Amino acid sequence: PSRWGQSPFTNVTIDWTVPRDLRDQAPFSGGEHLFEGIEDANLLALARERGANKLTELTYKHFQKEMNLINKAFYEVLTEGDSTGQPFTFPIPTVNITEDFDWEGENVPLLFENAAKIGSSYFQNFIGSQYTVNQHGERVPDERAYKPDAVRSMCCRLQLDLRELL
């Protein structure tokens, strides 16, 4: 309220694939599965195409297509800028680069076009960074390292380690 006419300083963490910690979680609204009590033949057919026999078996892993649509819309708007073509300064997106990052994904060119043209995004690299080498030269998980499913970035310096919050 005291920064009249200015965008609030905000950050969003963006995943390109459904994060491991959310893949098997069901989407909930009002304390129940998002599709509880819904009977719709078209939705059921879509759910079956995605590997679920019932609507209430759907988990976040079944919604990669929707994730792609959201990421696409976000980066199209972010890259286009405001009505005068000026870039948006906020929110600042932090994109998690994980070992399962889809480098050939449909939106990757849009992400990197934005990075080259505007430089909006921060990239949080989790490829190999959560491992260490033991005395036998083997790559093993480093328990002290940030884990992709336990960290949310808050701009350039602050990272929330969810393991410390729980």
Model regions: which residues?
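Conserved catalytic cores of very large enzyme subunits
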Residues: 1-166
